[in-house]
């Protein structure tokens, strides 16, 4: 499953996310307490068109840049439970219930790109 984030100020400015990165990113956003639980729930489904306003997007981008990226560094990843690892993603698909959480992570580079998108956007919609 994939998600397309479309800037509300320009139809040609968008950001693409797969479910593996997006689920983790939503947990990061949730930890900031910027958007409501209802909006977060809608953001977890593609094609909803839920809107993240400019101020929310900019705060998300700023907090990822200032709070999350310094903890990660270029060679680390963050999991959906917000734990951090320096192990590279080797593409293993974890099927065991106790290990499925390992399937969801976001790298420093991916979060940096998402943060940049948020900061440059006029708000965005999730499709």
Task: Name what the model sees in each region.
Residues 1-127:
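Acidic (Asp/Glu-rich) sequence patches and key acidic residues
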